[in-house]
Amino acid sequence: MAKQAKARRLAGIEAMAKVRTLRTSPRKLNLVAQSIRGLKVQRALNELEFSHKRIARDVRKALYSAISNAENNHNLDIDNLVVAEAFVGKNLIMKRFHARARGRASRIEKPFSEITIVVREQGEAA
């Protein structure tokens, strides 16, 4: 039996957004997540808008969701928000087959990923 994961507790100055089913591999998604980690949210949105990666559009939506959660649910100032964490996880793998020569078949795996973005309010001095 697998060990149950504990839910992450957010501090009072944090907000989070999760996207569970993104149709890309975790490796490709992590390239985009690395590019926004630690940036101010406005800078991160610009990075994602002008990124040439296909999945950057979905990560941008998730970041907007985290910003909205911070503003509406936690009453945080969106001008002082920083992308504190952006981490990627594996999800299910859709399996398909590809017909090959002599009646054989090969397996095609189409991976799904999930991303969690945590934004944190940074003080005025930072």
Swiss-Prot record:
The keyword RNA-binding applies. The keyword Ribosomal protein applies. Pfam families: Ribosomal_L22 (PF00237). Gene3D superfamilies: Ribosomal protein L22/L17. GO terms for cellular component: cytosolic large ribosomal subunit. GO terms for biological process: translation. InterPro entries: Ribosomal_uL22, Ribosomal_uL22_bac/chlpt-type, Ribosomal_uL22_bac/org-type, Ribosomal_uL22_sf. GO terms for molecular function: rRNA binding; structural constituent of ribosome. Part of the 50S ribosomal subunit. Belongs to the universal ribosomal protein uL22 family. This is Large ribosomal subunit protein uL22. It comes from Phenylobacterium zucineum (strain HLK1). The gene is rplV.
